[in-house]
Amino acid sequence: MSPSLFLGWGDDYFVVLWIHGRAVRLGRRQGVGRVIRVSLAMLILLALTFSPIVHATCVQTEPSTSANNGSWACSDQGEAFAKASSMGVPADLSVCRMKSIRAVSSGPGVFSQRMTYPGDTCGIGYDLDIGTGNATYPDTATCAKRPSQSGWTNPTAPTPSDVCNDGCYYTYAVDAGGPKGYTYVPSGATCTTDDAAPPIDDGGDGDDDGGGDGGGDGGGDGGGDGGGDGGGDGGGDGGGDGGGDGGGDGDGGGDGDGDGDGDGDGEEGGEGAPMSELYKKSGKTVESVLSKFNTQVRGTPMVAGIGDFMKVPSGGSCPVFSLGASKWWDAMTINFHCGGDFLAFLRAAGWVILAIAAYAAIRIAVT
């Protein structure tokens, strides 16, 4: 197939043009239309590279067909991985039973969507691994270059957890100086929401706080008014009952005095401090108490020491290994240890080893 700006099945040549800028390989005589298409493609790439928007939408550079999902230009590595992972099965290929679908790195700045069909379908006779679309990004705009985030809310609070945001994996890190007591740091690995849940946007905090304050103020005012009314009614009843009983019985003056004095004392009780002065609301909620407790516990020297012991000194990024393509296999990115069940297993194993060591230390100390 001859080289073209918008390729379908063999898009590697076009990718080389975008990464290395080798426009001279487009052909000897491109024509006015081809030059215009090249200029538009370069403008799109520059806009994605230097745009101030952190999370821009991927731009389609080749239209989709019934057999291919086309090509897309994205702003960074995470968005390109997420785009390639989200591509559906083309209509012409859905008649074959798909064995797997995935996004793989097919070179610097490129993720390709790959599908594998078993050999007993569509008359192929053998397992077939094909590409059905790709997403490109500037090779310097990696997940590791994204900034840390201190305004996100942990989706599994109060239990700490890592998150996946726009195709990039972020790890949970204790930050006593942050507004929430923790910060999310990009690990450099790609991910999907199957590996970790997305973070919760911080905009929801304002609504929660407003609701709590309103309820507290209403309760305080009601208590004060009730106390005042009760005292006034008590005094009136006491005076009436005392006078009536004393005059009628004669000898029963003792009863009259007793009733009068009792109700009169009740009147003084009604003039006491209203409820709003005896009780002042703190404004605390269950979530804020748990969050503060979690932050203070994690800031203690013992827990901080355990966290440092379990942390690999690799600069805050998960090591990701890449294996170039050959005639026998496709290019591979080995990053499964950076998230998901395998990462959870590694962490659990570390805590088990630490617990065994602590138990052994106690045995040595007491024997």
Curated annotation (Swiss-Prot):
One of its GO terms (biological process) is viral extrusion. Its main location: virion. Keywords: Host membrane, Host-virus interaction, Membrane, Transmembrane, Transmembrane helix, Viral attachment to host adhesion receptor, Viral attachment to host cell, Viral attachment to host cell pilus, Viral attachment to host entry receptor, Viral extrusion, Viral penetration into host cytoplasm, Viral penetration into host cytoplasm via pilus retraction, Viral release from host cell, Virion, Virus entry into host cell. The chain crosses the membrane at residues 342-362. GO terms for cellular component: host cell membrane; membrane; virion component. The keyword Signal does not apply. It is a single-pass membrane protein. Residues 212-251 have a biased composition (Gly residues). Belongs to the inovirus G3P protein family. Interacts with G6P; this interaction is required for proper integration of G3P and G6P into the virion. Interacts with G8P. Interacts with the tip of the host pilus. Interacts (via N-terminus) with host TolA. This is Attachment protein G3P. It comes from Xanthomonas phage phiLf.
